[in-house]
UniProtKB/Swiss-Prot annotation:
It catalyses: a 3'-end 3'-phospho-ribonucleotide-RNA + a 5'-end dephospho-ribonucleoside-RNA + GTP = a ribonucleotidyl-ribonucleotide-RNA + GMP + diphosphate; a 3'-end 2',3'-cyclophospho-ribonucleotide-RNA + a 5'-end dephospho-ribonucleoside-RNA + GTP + H2O = a ribonucleotidyl-ribonucleotide-RNA + GMP + diphosphate + H(+). Its EC number is 6.5.1.8. The gene is RTCB. The active site is at H428. Belongs to the RtcB family. Binds 2 manganese ions per subunit. Catalytic component of the tRNA-splicing ligase complex. This is RNA-splicing ligase RtcB homolog. Catalytic subunit of the tRNA-splicing ligase complex that acts by directly joining spliced tRNA halves to mature-sized tRNAs by incorporating the precursor-derived splice junction phosphate into the mature tRNA as a canonical 3',5'-phosphodiester. May act as an RNA ligase with broad substrate specificity, and may function toward other RNAs. The modification Phosphoserine is found at S300. SUPFAM superfamilies: Hypothetical protein PH1602. Mn(2+) 1 binds at D119, C122, H227. Keywords: Cytoplasm, GTP-binding, Isopeptide bond, Ligase, Manganese, Metal-binding, Nucleotide-binding, Nucleus, Phosphoprotein, tRNA processing, Ubl conjugation.
Length: 505
């Protein structure tokens, strides 16, 4: 029996201007409460989605994000609370922008592939240059074309980095270390990657032959969907000290942002795990509210296999972003007739926003070892945290927030408050407001492309018909999302970037 919208509201309570609480009882079996972070505009979207679902509009597709946050709060072994970030929107199992942590010492605690997502280690990398907007504007079209030529883009795109089956096995195990050994990365790139670009628990044997077959031709490719490479310029600096540590010292400085993941390989790892876990759930009698939340006990063979396979897919994604960095450096060097070194094309940072990792956190005054699921959310560790690079010890970890075609992107830094409230986690981007199908119905791709041209943005797209899905109108406002995190104190704004060229799948 479904409740009316007004009945649902009894379980929701505004804690402060940026945060709502979801009380136990909102969905069955909640072990902990839920929370979600919003501002007024984002709050309206969340409640509209719930109201539509109560009217019977919840058929087809996913549950509303609030319900999904509640269902995650009912998973065995969850601690503290189930958390929705400001860019939260409904997804498979977990909402995208929902994070949750599970107690590694609780034998009942689970790992859920739906809490990581299909594009394992989808993430963002930001490169800086010593170029200025005035250097790039005259050759903007050439540069966009050079990047489009160098980086294979689009749905079935194939890589240009030579790779055989043995290379793939090594890349799955070694991550950025493989790129370094093969000459596709610089030594200092590794320092500026989350996990230093390599998850040590990776086991290529836990990645199926089918997944490897899908992954082999796709290394160093951008893929379609919301993936992109953008040439951006610094539009605003909010924190000069943090920006300087990142090598950003003035407005108009040119950067490159790469947003990509583990392509077909990660998708297959997730699919394989979901099949195995359905069986494990029957065997171990694990009850969940939504069958998309298929999961397995962390210590079970299925749980361990998934974590090892997921880590390997994560390593693949880091190799992928490293390969595209290599190709970007080549494209820039070619257009400016110099070397990548002379252009100061260094990696500022590389973050993941679809991953599960073992971390130490303080819960109720005690340090605990947790399996932290971040899906559509980004790690944002505070200053002095042992897991962040030496360069950023005083600023906090850089957090890269990608906008959508034609909108701004941001660099944030992690905070102590985020550590206590959200397990050191913040938003990851804009978050969808319209489904892909709706975007295709409501928007015309030529209009979207014309609008970008009017904004002076050079664009290269492999599949123009997919452009509407990624149009800014399809998304929440990234500035709303970032400001909500900033006002809530879970991350702080450092730099704002605006695009001058977009390369898309």
């Amino acid at each position: 029996m479904s409740r009316s919208y007004n009945d649902e509201l009894q379980f929701l309570e505004k804690i402060n201007k940026n945060c709502w609480r979801i009380r136990k009882g909102f969905v069955p079996n909640m072990q902990v409460e839920g929370v979600f972070y919003v501002n007024d505009a984002l709050e309206k979207l969340m409640f509209e989605e719930l109201r539509n679902a109560c009217r019977g509009g919840g058929v087809g597709g996913f549950l509303p994000a609030m319900k999904q946050i509640g269902n995650v709060a009912a998973l065995p072994g969850i601690v503290h609370r189930s958390i929705g970030l400001p860019d939260v929107h409904s997804g498979y199992g977990f909402a995208i922008g929902n994070m949750a942590a599970f107690d590694m010492n609780d034998p009942e605690a689970v790992v859920s592939p739906g809490g990581v997502g299909f594009d394992i280690n989808c993430g963002v990398r930001l490169l800086r240059t010593n170029l200025d907007e005035s250097d790039v504007q005259p050759v903007k079209e050439q540069l966009a074309q050079a990047m489009f030529d160098h980086i294979p883009v689009g749905v079935g795109s194939k890589g240009v980095i030579p790779m055989n089956a043995k290379d793939l096995e090594e890349a799955l195990e070694m991550g950025v270390d493989w790129s370094l050994r093969e000459g596709y990365a610089w030594a200092e790139d590794k320092e500026h990657c989350e996990e230093y670009g390599r998850m040590l628990q990776a086991d290529p044997n836990k990645v199926s032959a089918r997944a490897k077959k899908r992954g082999l031709p796709q290394l160093g490719t951008l893929g379609a969907g919301n993936h992109y490479a953008e040439i951006q310029v610094v539009d605003e600096i909010f924190n000069e000290y943090a920006a300087k540590k990142m090598g950003i010292d003035h407005k108009g400085q040119v950067c490159v942002m790469i947003h990509s993941g583990s392509r077909g390989l990660g998708h297959q790892v997730a699919t394989d795990a979901l099949v195995a876990m359905e069986k494990a759930m029957k065997r171990d009698k694990i009850i969940v509210n939504d069958r998309q939340l298929a999961c397995a006990r962390i210590a079970s063979p299925e749980g361990q296999d998934y974590l090892k396979g997921m880590a390997a897919a994560g390593n693949y994604a880091w190799v992928n972003r490293s390969s595209m960095t290599f190709l970007t450096r080549q494209a820039f060097a070619k257009v400016f007739n110099t070397t990548p070194d002379d252009l100061d094309l260094h990696v500022i940072y590389d973050v993941s926003h679809n991953i599960a990792k073992v971390e130490q956190h303080v819960v109720d005054g005690k340090e605990r070892t947790l399996l932290v699921h971040r899906k559509g959310s980004t790690r944002a560790f505070p200053p002095h945290h042992p897991l962040i690079a030496v360069d950023y010890q005083l600023t906090g970890q850089p957090v890269l927030i990608g906008g959508t075609m034609g909108t701004c992107s941001y660099v944030l830094t992690g905070t102590e408050q985020g550590m206590t409230e959200t397990f050191g986690t913040t938003c990851h981007g804009a978050g969808r407001a319209l489904s892909r199908a709706k975007s295709r119905r409501n928007l015309d791709f030529q209009d979207v492309l014309d609008k970008l041209a009017d904004m002076g943005i050079a664009i290269r797209v492999a599949s123009p018909k997919l452009v509407m899905e990624e149009a800014p109108e399809s998304y929440k406002n990234v500035t709303d999302v970032v400001n909500t995190c900033h006002d809530a104190g879970i991350s702080k704004k450092a730099i704002k970037l605006r695009p001058i060229a977009v390369i898309k799948g």
